[in-house]
C-alpha cells in the first residue's frame, strides 16, 4: 500500500492517536506497540502516563 491508500483507510481516526488506537490499526497488542516505540521503530510522545502517536508517522512506518 502507498501513503494515499493508508491515508484514506485511516481517515476516520484522529491526527494524534492513542496507543490503543495505534495497536488496533497495526493489529498488535499494546505490549508489542510499546516494544516498537522503545526500539525506535515508531515515533511516539509520552504525555503523562500515555503514549501518543502522530497518524502521519504511523503511516510512514507502514509504508517503509
State the predicted function of each range.
Residues 26-52:
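Major-groove DNA-recognition helix of helix-turn-helix-type DNA-binding domains
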Residues 1-25, 31, 35, 55-64:
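Basic Lys/Arg-rich amphipathic helical interaction modules
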Amino acid at each position: 500500500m502507498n501513503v494515499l491508500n493508508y491515508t484514506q483507510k485511516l481517515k476516520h481516526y484522529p491526527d494524534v492517536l492513542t496507543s490503543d488506537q495505534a495497536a488496533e490499526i497495526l493489529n498488535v497488542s499494546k505490549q508489542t506497540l510499546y516494544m516498537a516505540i522503545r526500539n525506535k521503530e515508531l515515533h511516539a510522545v509520552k504525555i503523562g502516563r500515555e503514549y501518543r502517536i502522530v497518524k502521519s508517522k504511523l503511516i510512514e512506518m507502514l509504508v517503509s
